[in-house]
């Protein structure tokens, strides 16, 4: 596939690095990026320096015969104009744009169509991050929750702790503990090293476990791996940006929400838009303010400003003063592994969340959803099976008969309204939504090839 990526920031470069290793022809365009030459030398891709909204630059980048244009510059307006150019001048078949401005998003149905601004898929990082955070709050104790198949199937990452019924026992004991609930353990990380899950594997405290199940069973299964936490009811948010506002808006009807914003004008505006949230104009590093607002009774402290260092420091302070959980928004991916799992419980990366959404539109085959896991190392894909026993490599075959590379696990599938956890004897049928776990994203081309029907399939 020939793909043009506009914007060589964190998202653009990470997307290029993900796709270039999957036998794609990648061209990266940016106006001024010191990384361009380095990226070209490091990876098998082409770079073009110039304005991403310039017809000449797009022509030089090969827009005339590109299969896909992905506009992820820092400017919504440049992204929109670039997609317009791709549609009007070059007939680029598929156009994806990152749009951040909430005013544009509120009018998306009227604005973004082929009669107006021709964008096929919108990516809104702020909305995606808001979704991610609210999922984590809905499942206290989870490190990551990703939904698939119309939210019927979920992949969940948790830490095993003493108090979980399965801790100290073999995985095979799960069926004895919960005979009416099915799930599959996809991976175990122990002391940072992966362990292949087997029935005889003993679950140890501190293990990071990734499992797949019907969404309705998440909490029951988490209770086997750790002592279930009470629902979060008291939430304190730091920051007044779109993410902080979005999270407060979603939570204020079900939780007691307090929000701290340093800028007085922004605090006033937020107070008017969030009638059930208590908004403070103040500094989250002010210990007196935190004490006055009973930080020791806060269930989860969310540091969601645009400043990584400020987020980290305020979360560390909040935990020291008694907050039960701390979650931070982190822009720099390098920071995440340094801080998560220590004093700070969860770090959320807008870049990784955005990359997941982009990959769902870029992957070959009938891919419906993608989630990056373990901060970009692993991946989960929801893909639809097409064809029949004569035209497909998988339809009509038992899962146990498929020759899957090491590290690829078929976890579950949705057939009609039924969630089926993958077992060796399950036969894949046409139209099944299949959720696959890849411990190494380098195996993505193998999955795309496996699910591609033959040329005779109509």
From Swiss-Prot:
Q: Which cysteines are joined by disulfide bonds?
A: none
Keyword NADP (UniProt): no
Locate the RCK N-terminal domain: which residues?
1-123, 232-348
Gene Ontology, cellular component aspect: plasma membrane
The UniProt keywords, alphabetically, are: Ion transport, NAD, Potassium, Potassium transport, Repeat, Transport
Function, please?
A: Part of a potassium transport system.
Per the record, the domain comment is: The RCK N-terminal domain binds NAD and possibly other effectors. This is expected to cause a conformation change that regulates potassium transport.
User: What is this protein's record name?
Assistant: Trk system potassium uptake protein TrkA
Organism, scientific name? Haemophilus influenzae (strain ATCC 51907 / DSM 11121 / KW20 / Rd)
């Amino acid at each position: 596939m020939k793909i043009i990526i506009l914007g060589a920031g964190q998202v653009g470069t990470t997307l290029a690095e993900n796709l270039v290793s999957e036998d794609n022809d990648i061209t990266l365009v940016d106006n001024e990026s010191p990384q361009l030459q380095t990226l070209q030398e490091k990876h098998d891709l082409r770079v073009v320096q110039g304005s991403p909204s310039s017809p000449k630059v797009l022509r030089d980048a090969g827009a005339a015969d590109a299969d896909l244009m992905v506009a992820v510059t820092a400017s919504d307006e440049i992204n929109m104009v670039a997609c317009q150019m791709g549609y009007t001048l070059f007939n680029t078949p598929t156009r994806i744009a990152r749009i951040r401005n909430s005013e544009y998003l509120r009018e998306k149905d009227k604005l973004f169509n082929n009669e107006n601004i021709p964008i096929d898929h919108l990516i809104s990082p702020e909305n995606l991050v808001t979704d991610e955070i609210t999922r984590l709050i809905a499942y206290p104790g989870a490190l990551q929750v990703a939904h698939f198949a119309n939210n019927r199937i979920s992949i969940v990452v948790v830490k095993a702790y003493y108090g979980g019924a399965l801790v100290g026992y073999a995985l095979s004991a799960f069926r004895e503990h919960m005979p009416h609930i099915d799930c599959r353990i996809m991976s175990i990380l122990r002391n940072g090293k992966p362990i292949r899950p087997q029935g005889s594997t003993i679950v140890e405290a501190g293990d990071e476990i990734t499992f797949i199940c019907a969404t309705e069973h998440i909490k029951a299964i988490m209770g086997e791996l750790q002592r279930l936490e009470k629902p979060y009811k008291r939430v304190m948010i730091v920051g007044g940006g779109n993410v902080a506002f979005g999270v407060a808006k979603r939570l204020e009807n079900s939780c007691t929400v307090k929000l701290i914003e340093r800028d007085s004008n922004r605090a006033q505006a937020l107070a008017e838009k969030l009638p059930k949230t208590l908004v403070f104009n103040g500094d989250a590093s002010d210990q007196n303010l935190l004490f006055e607002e009973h930080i020791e009774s806060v269930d989860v402290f969310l540091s969601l400003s645009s400043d990584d260092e400020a987020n980290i420091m305020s979360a560390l302070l909040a935990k020291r003063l008694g907050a039960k959980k701390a979650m931070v928004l982190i822009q720099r991916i390098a920071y995440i592994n340094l801080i998560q799992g220590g004093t700070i419980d969860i770090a959320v990366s807008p870049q990784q969340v955005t990359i997941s959404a982009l990959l769902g539109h870029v992957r070959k085959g009938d891919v419906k959803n993608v989630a990056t896991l373990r901060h970009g190392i692993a991946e989960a894909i929801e893909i639809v099976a097409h064809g029949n026993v004569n035209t497909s490599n998988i339809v009509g075959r038992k899962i146990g008969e498929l020759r899957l590379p090491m590290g690829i696990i078929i976890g579950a599938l949705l057939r009609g309204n039924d969630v089926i956890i993958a077992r060796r004897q399950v036969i894949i049928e046409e139209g099944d939504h299949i959720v696959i776990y890849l411990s190494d994203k380098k195996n993505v081309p193998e999955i795309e090839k496996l699910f591609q029907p033959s040329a005779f399939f109509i």
